[in-house]
């Protein structure tokens, strides 16, 4: 893929993402923290109004920090330690729903996803990847996303 370069997998974000896009990020132990850190470090000043949709996340959740509120708008479908403060302080949104309802939100475009940032295994000899440790709604998000 020409948009991912070098051994450090530097991503040319302008080919994937633009201001105003809605991204879905993987959940629980499969949060793509390295991708999100790279996006924040390289593009936080160049992008704005990126809606980040996710269910429960583990880790630092830099995108949910107040200093990035002009770049990222968090839309948490479940609340956890890393997102509760942002919602309480009203610089993030909480959309309560049942886990079983989320795939339909993506498929019927009630909540259209532009880009899905997810963790997958390396491809096997046949080119198939596993969604790994946290599949839940990730499959629906990946299939529904523009990219």
What are the residue ranges of the model-derived segments?
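Conserved alpha/beta enzyme-core scaffold
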Residues: 1-147
